[in-house]
């Protein structure tokens, strides 16, 4: 079992932390250098967490638990127009990233308006490529309830946010509802906003833990972080990809930000513990920019 952590410190002697992660059999999920600061999201064997903490103290850094690291979350807004963005949804996105999440903003083509909103099948397919979807809706209870058709048949856990208090049973298809996050024409910096964001983090972590527990009953044939590491080491084109996190971990697979038509053969032939990746995963064309989506097969699939 692995524990996901975030290391925050200076870039001086950062290589010592990277080398320790590798020596312990861990994996770097994501690494960011911001001026003189280094932030590393990592997965470490549970028994070795104390060693990472000791090294962090030695380097005058900080270690925090990052339960969302290694997941990809969709934050869905009814539209990209200022009517719904940028404020609440963007602050939700930024806040989740503090806890290790990799999130993507998705604006529906015609999701605005209580009586005119809609969602296409293509948009649903894109949302379902993620681990969890957060639908950032508005401030009116009746409008939020009537827009439940946007997500009632989406095949991943769905969290809905809005301003009023609503019982989740009134929202068909939603796994959870978090209030206090409607349309707010400013940054979410006030006390009640921060409390609502913290509640959203707790709710998201709870749903991800439930999904992990469910997957544990029939786990993937290989951990997604192991597959991520294998692809990064065996597909040379990854080093030439300038997108953020060119191989993005998910609970049940990875998103490889390389063109499927050009590179899918290289990805299919990646060796993972002596087996071709194509033998232990479904490798398909993503609905996001034509990237390559790898979804790992469960152990029961080979019985």
Predicted regions and their residues:
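Long, charge-rich C-terminal accessory regions
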Residues: 92-95, 99-261
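Helix-enriched interaction subdomains in cytosolic or periplasmic regions
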Residues: 24-55
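Conserved short beta-strand edge segments in small beta-sheet-based binding/regulatory domains
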Residues: 5, 27-33, 54-77
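Generic non-transmembrane alpha-helical segments
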Residues: 16-24, 55, 59, 95, ...
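C-terminal, charge/polar-rich interaction regions
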Residues: 245-303
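Short, low-order "capping/linker" segments at domain edges
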Residues: 72-95
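Short amphipathic alpha-helix segments
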Residues: 8-29, 52
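Short glycine-/aliphatic-rich beta-strand segments at the starts of folded cytosolic domains
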Residues: 1-9
